[in-house]
């Protein structure tokens, strides 16, 4: 009997120990994602506390959400629990839940957090949201949460974005390079890439959600875009039902307005927006000189000085519509349509006077006045459709996409001359070239793109992606010149006109690999592109030709998460730029006979290699991003100006042998860029934000004929924002820049400042803003210098940047489902942007 009790006692003890051991080893996993209820963006660094319901004072687990608002953690035990999520300035989220024995996962799915709306007496609960996020290959700036977005253009907001600089002339650089591409909602926008300054200057920032700087594009992106990619994500999300926002602005420079709306019905969601702005440009003034250096003086040389002014006005409009339809939980179709563009009109006059280089006190060689009036338009119209297929395996995805884009542009100008009597008779033939003329130009680029992308996880640590693309791109340009006869009638000048087509067939394929092990993540990629270029001349000089390009483009990046709030990133990529229609157009522009310009249709694609290292640390108090970058190119496309007799310019009619400046584009040789960028945001108090975006760039450029230049340029943008009681906000911004370096000279230095105040009403549905910039001085001066063998050319420009006005926006309705977009879509970023500088044709 005693033996039986002993055995039974041992069995009870063993079973108790086993039960206790099983209880101790029992654990489950909690996961989910925390999003801002209005913007649908991840809420970073929110604090999560999990306790037993019967012991709320003792925390079982404490954790924080990551940069995307995601959280995942193991929790011991079973029974009843309480999870509390808190974030500064937010209403806490409290979730009760139970876990039974054997349950391994509690998935909370998507949780939405809202701003705290309670007031304790006269004390408001406020906080500064982080405006910058960093990933292994990109940095994101949250425009929507920046109060300055209510009164600024997108171009002004770009000055705040890390790794982006915008100088006083509104020239944009990404990673220290002016060669970059612009996307909208993950899709390339060629109009923005070709005319970023004009388009972004006209876009209201309150229509933008955030701006991404993709510093190390992976293999799925086209190989083009030396500096990187700017992805502008427009406002397009909210809460279930419908929403619409209306805005208007008026200033001393013009007026504008816009509307945005989203509606959801069943599985169909549609959003649309439209903006229009009219801009009146105050009169600006220009002056300059074009002098021959002593060693280059000949009997055909002259020094030229000029002085002029110009006034104009223009408009810009943009609109887009997106729709998505969920066929089922695994299949999604999206469609999109977009339009961007505008027009400008201007008129002005310039006085020229030429003197002998060796005797500036002698009588002028000649003098004349040129009167110009012009109008132009530029648009980009695109449409696309995407089909996305998900699978039961998480993150496995197949996407098919088609996109069509057309970019029509027109220019129409008249130039009339008045030649003063008393000119030197040796220059009579030269002055006879000054015939009143009418130039009528049309350019267009139409492209069709077909693309397939596939991505799949391999186990828990690996990701594989592959894809293929075909682009059919047709560039066409028609530049017609009409010269006035003695009666004033304009006759078509076929010899000075140019019609040509530039056809591209681009076939590409890529393969990418990703690895993520605990705190370490890395990506490797390889892309192959084959390009067939076919150039045909319909009117004007030039021989038809065909060129083939083969490019193998590698990329690699590695990131290490030092802590939950800081990371280190290292990357390498190779990028290429195919010349665009502006730099290719062979149209010979001799409106100013002393400065003749044209494009170069035989340019090769430009190839650049870049290495970058960056460190980021983002906390509720401090945001810091520091990066260093080095890039080099051995066949950079640059604008080159030379002094030469006009008889050496091929295709120029009625040359006289006089010395003139000839400007074109060429693959010049070597460029080397080294840069250091820093971004700091300090939330000094829950109501005060102080920030600075700065960069230092060293440039080395080397071309043919001994051309070489190097030097440093510095850029800094800083400011402060103060939140006052009752939803008042005030912002002050200042920026400055030293002269930037060019192959044959340098640009100008700048100083700029602005102030804005805004107030929200009606539960933040109504926002009023007042703004002013450069209010102490109406006109700003800038200058640039171009030097070459035998000449120095200086340009001075006086223009108004003074601006003040008011804006208003009002939001109605609510919406819970944003327009769903496929995770992969078409991205064409392979054309080097041109500009409205010296070159043929123009876009």
Regions of interest found by a model, annotated:
Residues 35-38, 49-51, 86-90, 105-147, ...:
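Short, acidic, small-residue-rich periplasmic hinge/interaction motif at the N-terminus
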Residues 53-58, 80-96:
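A short, solvent-exposed loop/turn motif at the edges and junctions
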Residues 54-70:
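Short, acidic Ser/Thr/Gly-rich low-complexity loop/linker segments typical of extracellular
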Residues 110-111, 154-157, 196-198, 213, ...:
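N-terminal periplasmic accessory domains that precede
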Residues 154, 160, 187-215:
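Short acidic/polar hinge/loop motifs at secondary-structure boundaries
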Residues 228-246, 284, 305, 315-322, 532-534, 564-609, 630-657, 773-789, ...:
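Surface-exposed extracellular loop regions of Gram-negative outer-membrane beta-barrel proteins
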Residues 447-451, 491-498, 598-600, 604, ...:
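Outer membrane beta-barrel strand-and-loop segments of large Gram-negative receptors
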């Amino acid at each position: 009997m005693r033996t039986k009790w002993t055995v039974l006692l041992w069995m009870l003890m063993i079973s108790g120990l086993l039960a206790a051991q099983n209880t101790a080893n029992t654990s489950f996993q909690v996961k989910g994602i925390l999003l801002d209820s209005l913007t649908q963006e991840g809420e970073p660094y929110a604090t999560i506390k999990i306790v037993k319901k019967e012991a709320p004072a003792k925390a079982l687990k404490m954790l924080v959400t990551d940069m995307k608002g995601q959280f995942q953690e193991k929790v011991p035990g079973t029974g009843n629990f309480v999870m509390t999520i808190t974030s500064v300035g937010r209403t806490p989220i409290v979730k009760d839940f139970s876990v039974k024995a054997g349950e391994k996962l509690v998935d909370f799915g998507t949780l939405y957090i809202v701003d705290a709306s309670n007031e304790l007496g006269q004390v408001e609960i406020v906080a500064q949201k982080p405006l910058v996020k960093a990933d292994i290959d990109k940095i994101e700036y949250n425009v929507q949460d920046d109060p300055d977005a209510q009164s600024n253009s997108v171009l002004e907001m770009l000055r705040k974005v890390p790794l982006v600089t915008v100088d006083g002339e509104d020239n944009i650089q990404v990673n220290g390079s002016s060669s970059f591409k612009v996307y909208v909602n993950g899709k390339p926008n060629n109009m923005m890439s070709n005319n970023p300054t004009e388009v972004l200057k006209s876009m209201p920032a309150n229509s933008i959600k955030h701006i991404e700087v993709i510093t190390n594009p992976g293999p799925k992106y086209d190989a083009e875009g030396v500096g990187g990619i700017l992805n502008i994500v427009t406002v397009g999300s909210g809460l279930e039902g419908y929403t619409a926002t209306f805005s208007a602005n008026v200033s001393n420079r013009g007026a504008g307005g816009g509307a945005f709306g989203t509606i959801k019905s069943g599985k169909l969601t549609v959003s649309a927006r439209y903006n229009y702005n009219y801009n009146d440009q105050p009169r600006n003034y220009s002056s300059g000189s074009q002098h021959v250096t002593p060693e280059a003086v000949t009997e055909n040389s002259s020094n030229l000085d000029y002085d002029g002014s110009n006034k104009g006005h223009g408009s810009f409009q943009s609109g887009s519509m997106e729709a998505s339809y969920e066929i089922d939980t695994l299949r999604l179709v999206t469609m999109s349509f977009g339009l961007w563009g505008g027009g400008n009109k201007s008129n002005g006059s310039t006085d020229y006077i030429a003197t002998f280089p060796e005797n500036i006190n002698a009588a002028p060689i000649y003098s004349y006045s040129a009167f110009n009036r012009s109008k132009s338009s530029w648009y980009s119209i695109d449409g696309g459709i995407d089909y996305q297929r998900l699978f039961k395996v998480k993150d496995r995805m197949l996407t098919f996409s088609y996109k069509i884009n057309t970019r029509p542009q027109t220019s129409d100008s008249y130039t009339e001359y008045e030649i003063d009597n008393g000119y030197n008779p040796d220059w009579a033939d030269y002055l006879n070239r000054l015939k009143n003329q009418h130039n009528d130009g049309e350019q267009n680029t139409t492209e069709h793109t077909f693309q397939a992308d596939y991505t799949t996880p391999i186990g828990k640590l690996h990701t594989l992606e592959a894809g293929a693309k075909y682009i059919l791109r047709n560039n066409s340009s028609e530049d017609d010149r009409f010269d006035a006869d003695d009666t004033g009638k304009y006759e078509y000048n076929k010899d000075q006109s140019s019609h040509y087509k530039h056809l591209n067939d681009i076939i590409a394929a890529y393969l990418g690999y990703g690895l993520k092990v605990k705190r370490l993540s890395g990506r490797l990629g390889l892309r192959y592109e084959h390009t067939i270029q076919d150039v045909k001349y319909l009117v004007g000089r030039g021989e038809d030709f065909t060129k083939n390009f083969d490019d193998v483009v590698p990329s690699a990046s590695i990131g290490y998460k030092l802590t939950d709030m800081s990371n280190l990133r290292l990357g390498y990529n190779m990028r290429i730029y195919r010349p665009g229609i502006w730099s290719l157009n062979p149209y010979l522009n001799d409106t100013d006979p002393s400065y003749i310009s044209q494009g170069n249709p035989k340019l090769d694609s430009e190839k650049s290699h870049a290495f970058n290292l960056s460190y980021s640390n983002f906390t509720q108090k401090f945001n810091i991003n520091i990066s260093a970058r080095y890039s080099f190119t051995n066949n950079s496309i640059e604008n080159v100006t030379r002094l030469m007799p006009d008889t050496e310019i091929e295709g120029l009619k009625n040359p006289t042998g006089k010395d003139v400046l000839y400007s074109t584009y060429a693959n010049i040789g070597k460029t080397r860029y080294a840069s250091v960028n820093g971004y700091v945001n300090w939330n000094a108090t829950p109501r005060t934000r102080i920030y600075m975006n700065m960069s230092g760039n060293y440039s080395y450029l080397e071309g043919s004929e001994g051309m070489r230049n190097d030097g440093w340029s510095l850029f800094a943008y800083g400011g402060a924002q103060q939140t006052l009681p009752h939803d008042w906000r005030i912002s002050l911004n200042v920026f400055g820049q030293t002269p930037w370096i060019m192959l044959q000279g340098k640009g100008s230095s700048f100083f700029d400042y602005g102030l804005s105040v805004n107030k929200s009403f009606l539960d933040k549905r109504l926002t009023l803003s007042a703004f002013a910039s450069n209010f102490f001085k109406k006109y700003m001066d800038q200058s640039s210098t171009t030097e070459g063998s035998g000449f120095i050319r200086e340009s001075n420009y006086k223009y108004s940047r003074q601006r003040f006005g008011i804006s208003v926006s009002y939001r109605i309705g609510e919406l819970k489902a944003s327009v769903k977009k496929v995770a992969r879509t078409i991205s064409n970023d392979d054309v080097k942007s041109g500009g409205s500088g010296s070159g043929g044709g123009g876009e």
